Amino acid sequence: MTTETVTTTAGGTVGRIRLGNTLYVAIAIITVAFANFTPLSAYVLNLLMQASTYAIAVLGLTIVLGYTGQINLAQAAFFSLGAYSVALGTTTFGLPFMPALVLGVALACIAGGVLGLTSLRLGGHYLAMVTISFQTMLSLILTNWVALTRGPDGVTNIKRPALFGDYFLDSGHYLAMCIAALFGVGFLVWHLRKTRLGRAMQAVRDNELAAGVTGINTYGTKVVAFTLSALLGGFGGGLFAGGFSYISPDQFTFGESIVFLTMVLIGGSRSPLGTVLGTGLLILLPEWLRFLKNVYLAVYGGAVILIMVFMPDGIWGFVTALWHKLNPPTRFTPGAIAPLPLTHEVARADGSLILRVTSLSKHFGGLKAVDEVDLAVARNTVHALIGPNGSGKTTLLNVLSGIYWPTAGCIELDNHDVTRLQPYQRAGCGLGRTFQNIRLFGDMSIIDNVMVGAERPNHVVAGHAAGLIRHVLAALDFVGLADRAYEAVGSLSYGHQRLVEIARALAGSPKLLLLDEPGAGLNHVEKDGLVGLLKRLKGHGLTICIIDHDMDLVEQIADHITVLNFGRRIAGGTPEEVLRDPKVVAAYLGEGRVDVSP
């Protein structure tokens, strides 16, 4: 694919995005104008105000749950912070509506940030319990701190925004403002997916371990997502208070957080459009079914259950999957793509070391998985780690990439001590990694998977959209998958998924590439292709440290071999030296494997 072709492809994508944005803005203007100028009954106005303000809060759950995969069972608490800030600000403290709303959003944002900072390392059901506790605590405060919140009696006469002096917005105009806010928030949340932060969130959701090694600050990303979720909760709550002019603690209980969660799950947690759809259904469906009188709640509950059972990804997820099934993505035919710069450092064949490991140990209680290992990897060489199963090879790679903290020892990458750096920081220093068991971001496209690798910290192409796309396509072209860039990664065969994982690592232009059994699970044809790819990488001067049990593969590409057994280094040298070493033959190769190809 030539530069012109890449530009044309990118230009077509940009054109579609601009068209979609134009249509979205047009629909927003028409909807806001309709709400502003069409007389509606008080009943309908209240329903639509509730739906629009709830939808803003539920869009926060799209970010934290749908995009990032973190549970939040306290969205009603953040909603209440915004609501009570507007309610008390405009009544007790005499603030205008807008400053009170800003205060509410700020309080929700701060509360979400603090809660995220202190609890997101827990994850799973522990995080769920923390958010439930926060929700319960805040509900008790709202009910019992009567001097401030007015307790169970609630707050009345909440002021709306004033346009001219004492003229406050009526319900129709206020509804138009809420709908405009919903369209604005929806636009931002929709486009968040295709930003660097959005891809980082989705990577954390799909595979947190791989995300960290690829260069994403997983903890920081989760905290940002949780904070944004709380911010939108507070924003929606503030607008809600202005819409109804009365609030009380029983509107913001744990049960309401469950309602918010149900809304996002029914509509489809990974799509803002699905979120709005789910919110509308849960608010409007009971009203539509009221003609059934005594049985309408049973019908309503049954409808919700059926949606959850038969559409586990929500209504919008079901529709999207059906659309992709009926309209599979088409491949584009690449021409000549500019060669991939495998590394942005100046290649040096002077024998200097890119990696120095000194007395490295990793103990799990009494088990010495890695025990005082010394390792030196020369620049622009292929260094193989071999040994029997359980010898500590993968554990060593996990320590090198920061997944495990060493018990003792030192790791230097390109003359920088990285022993105590986090995985994403080591990626920023130029360390790339693949896994024995393929770890891709399963719900992202192939090109987005590789783009995450290219956006590692300190990478020269990160943040430059056109150059980033060209670089990512070049990485895919290097492994032979450029024509499938826009397909779902889950549609690929096992062997092709292995190539995508390698392309993701290459896209980061690593100084050192760690490959953990890249040939595992491949058939003969795929393995021959892998050998050819590794030879090309070696020919480009990329420094590689590889683990593999296929000695034919190792002999063909390795310049140096280190052998581990029971966590200790037992041999090291050229393939000819190591594979004839009696200790290696006895520990790993067996007596029948003593000849080495010239």
What do these predicted regions represent?
Residues 193, 203, 216, 346-349, ...:
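Residue-level marker of regulatory loop/turn positions in helix-turn-helix DNA-binding domains and
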Residues 42, 99, 155, 164, ...:
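A generic alpha-helix propensity feature with a strong bias for hydrophobic helices
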Residues 318-353, 459-470:
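Pre-NBD coupling/linker segments of ABC/ABC-like ATPases
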Residues 33, 122, 186, 287, ...:
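Residue-level detector of alpha-helix boundaries and kinks
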Residues 351-356, 362-598:
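Glycine-rich phosphate-binding loops of nucleotide-dependent enzymes
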Residues 2-337:
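Transmembrane alpha-helices and adjacent helix-loop boundaries
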